[in-house]
Design a protein with these regions (language model features):
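Conserved coupling/switch loop of ABC ATPases
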Residues: 94, 112
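Domain-scale signature associated with acetyltransferase and cell-envelope carbohydrate enzymes
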Residues: 1-73, 77-83, 89-92, 100, ...
Length: 134
């Protein structure tokens, strides 16, 4: 987290419009974006029921984060805790919390909560390793 975020600024978010970093938020008034977050290009966030992205979270490109599902009607806030990492092309479904310092591998489908300090991946994402706290 050194030089990469040296000049970090809160992005300008307009409803259903791409940010200058090429990601988009629907229902942006329900998005809480932490300090020094990194959201990859072509990521889609639907924050209708709340999305919280805490400090130092990194989200890869082409991810989708949903707080509502029109297919099964499931709704619920999504929380990405401090220093969580979401690999590119991953999907997070409604009501999920990804714990602090956890890492989600690329192309994963996160349907259930992931505890802090874990590595998880797959369809559906499963914890494969617990990380040692430093």
């Amino acid at each position: 987290m050194t030089e990469r975020f040296k000049n970090w600024k809160y992005p300008i978010i307009k409803e259903r419009k791409m940010t200058k970093y090429n990601w988009v938020v629907q229902n942006s008034k329900h998005l809480k974006l932490g300090y020094k977050t990194d959201i990859g290009a072509f990521t889609y966030i639907n924050a209708k029921n709340g999305v919280v992205i805490e400090d130092h979270v990194q989200i890869g490109s082409h991810c989708s984060i949903y707080s509502i599902s029109t297919i099964d009607g499931k709704e619920g806030p999504v929380v990405l805790k401090k220093n969580a990492h979401l690999g590119s092309h991953s999907i997070v479904l409604p009501g999920v919390t990804i714990g602090e310092n956890s890492i989600i591998g690329a192309f994963s489908l996160v349907k259930k909560n992931i505890p802090a300090n874990c590595i998880a991946f797959g369809i559906p994402a499963k914890v494969i390793k617990r990380l040692k706290r430093q």
